[in-house]
């Protein structure tokens, strides 16, 4: 069993963390890229089989996405399960979690993972039935974060949120109609931030299981932000409060 990843950052990140997962790598024939050459040398030093391929082959393997001239066939990584969450929480005095409810675009999932990694989030939680898959597109956008931030898929998000509350984790949800803003919130301790789908927001049951609702103040004419942008804003306000 194998999966495909593509893009310089995604391949580089996996090489640094788990070189044993590589099976073979395809490089665009004739491409001379100063960012690509050191990566090729590093792959070769690990004994990874590298093959030259034309653009049509790479485009087909990546479903027409921007692959930057490199695609790798790799062994699947660790799949975190719902029952891994208590152990992950126990590793930290102040767990910092991100919950994504209804983020179904892999580009947005990848961007949220990238922001989560940069902010020091310990795990990202998504529902099994309303979430994008962690596919090659999401991994490329994540720029390596998909290999460092545990992504946990849960069967029942509301039940998981209740479990988090039993672990004394404060759950902060984002909603446009919240009565106070992100900058009036208190997020210094054990917490989980909940982000809903762009436009739709959180589902009703998810909203009802939040301990606090906050909004991002908007000064312009647009009514909402892309979920990955909003996630970055909220995460780094939490980081500011936690440091």
UniProtKB/Swiss-Prot annotation:
InterPro entries: 23S_rRNA_MeTrfase_RlmB, Alpha/beta_knot_MTases, Ribosomal_eL30-like_sf, rRNA_MeTrfase_TrmH, SpoU_MeTrfase, SpoU_subst-bd, tRNA_m1G_MTases_N. Keywords: Cytoplasm, Methyltransferase, rRNA processing, S-adenosyl-L-methionine, Transferase. GO terms for cellular component: cytosol. It comes from the Bacteria. Its EC number is 2.1.1.185. Disulfide bonds: none annotated. GO terms for molecular function: RNA binding; rRNA (guanosine-2'-O-)-methyltransferase activity. S-adenosyl-L-methionine binds at residues 196, 216, 225. It catalyses: guanosine(2251) in 23S rRNA + S-adenosyl-L-methionine = 2'-O-methylguanosine(2251) in 23S rRNA + S-adenosyl-L-homocysteine + H(+). It is found in: Cytoplasm. CDD domains: SpoU-like_RlmB. It is an enzyme of class 2 (transferase). It holds the Pfam family SpoU_sub_bind. Specifically methylates the ribose of guanosine 2251 in 23S rRNA. NCBIfam families: PRK11181.1 (NF008386), rRNA_methyl_3 (TIGR00186). Homodimer. Belongs to the class IV-like SAM-binding methyltransferase superfamily. RNA methyltransferase TrmH family. RlmB subfamily. This is 23S rRNA (guanosine-2'-O-)-methyltransferase RlmB. It comes from Salmonella typhimurium (strain LT2 / SGSC1412 / ATCC 700720). The lineage of its organism: Bacteria, Pseudomonadati, Pseudomonadota, Gammaproteobacteria, Enterobacterales.
